[in-house]
């Protein structure tokens, strides 16, 4: 990215690239008037980015604040942490039963053979 001064219009309506040319200054660089252009090179950008930090340690940042915890501290993680699962998903239950070697107990009691629904 190159930053430079805006172009000025001369008396004839054409754009002048160097305002010193209109005042009669020589075409060379004048030591009394610094050039106000800043050229950013790849090396300058690499140096700039290598100095950046992901931590909140920049001088323009406010001191780090302690944020309140999102969840209150757990007294007993085993008894208080409950993960919700979709009620229709029986795969985890089947895997648990396979690991334990138990026979599955049906969620709904089996109806007697004589109780059949008529449609």
Swiss-Prot record:
Location(s), subcellular: Cytoplasm; Nucleus
Domain of life: Eukaryota
Pfam families: HPIP
Keywords of the record: Cytoplasm, Nucleus
Coiled coil region boundaries: none
GO cellular component, one term: cytoplasm
Record's subunit section: Interacts with HCFC1.
Primary role: Regulates HCFC1 activity by modulating its subcellular localization. Overexpression of HCFC1R1 leads to accumulation of HCFC1 in the cytoplasm. HCFC1R1-mediated export may provide the pool of cytoplasmic HCFC1 required for import of virion-derived VP16 into the nucleus.
Designated name of the protein: Host cell factor C1 regulator 1
Naturally occurring in which organism (per UniProt): Bos taurus (Bovine)
Gene label: HCFC1R1
